[in-house]
Amino acid sequence: MSSQDLPPRTLPSQESEPLYGGRRPGRVTVRDIAAAKARGEKWAMLTAYDALTAGIFDEAGIPVLLVGDSAGNVVFGYETTIPVTVDHLIPLTAAVVRGTRRAMVVADLPFGSYQASPGEALHAAARFMKEAGAHAVKLEGGQRVAPHVEELVGAGVPVMGHVGLTPQSVHALGGFRVQGRGSEAGDRLLHDAKALEAAGAFAVVLEGIPSELGARITQTLAIPTIGIGAGPDCDAQVLVWQDMAGLSARSPKFAKRYADVAATLRDAATEFAADVAAGAFPTEQYSYR
């Protein structure tokens, strides 16, 4: 596929153009993301874990791809994201970078790779950028990790924050529960989001919070908010791609299924097996002379 065939994308020098409508190809940057919020332009983010899928999403015009620690669930088969390590995610991130030409690729910092100190966070982030080619990293937490964000940003690492339902803290939260209900809890989450913004984060994910709180945080922050179960008023929306495409066996309430990929794959595998059993595959068309 030539560069002329790819969906157009904004370059930093073309901030007046929409995120989905620039004239020349080029990687999406944090400046483009900021400009989209200033224009009131909403955009989508998806997870990706391999080059082939990432390339499809890139061709579809998805401007930001997240190599999430959700790979623990949908790639490695863990019940939570907690077992995921930097060494798990670096090859996945590198594959997504290689498979794309336009999307910004954000890598999750997994549990245990950054919480101890800002220096530990920088070490992990540097590995993702040097070894995998990530364009930014994401970490979970609010006020407590603000010094970590400040350290990373000061070293030249773009940082995406994440507050609300933070899967790495699932045990401390008592399970996958909606966060920020009630005025006091909502105020705490707003304070956390503002702390991330003040520390230099270029965007913040809002997960599993009431719609009204998502709107309030979005209106308060100058940086973009990315909702996942946070209502329709966030600046952007993100889904795990297996949930979005109907590959996951179970999906959370906030995940709309836009396809039934599981059924398509199951039918294809069933038909293939039946053809082989019947001697109907391979035919001469699929054989060499």
Where are these regions (language model features)?
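Alpha/beta enzyme core
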Residues: 2-259, 263-289
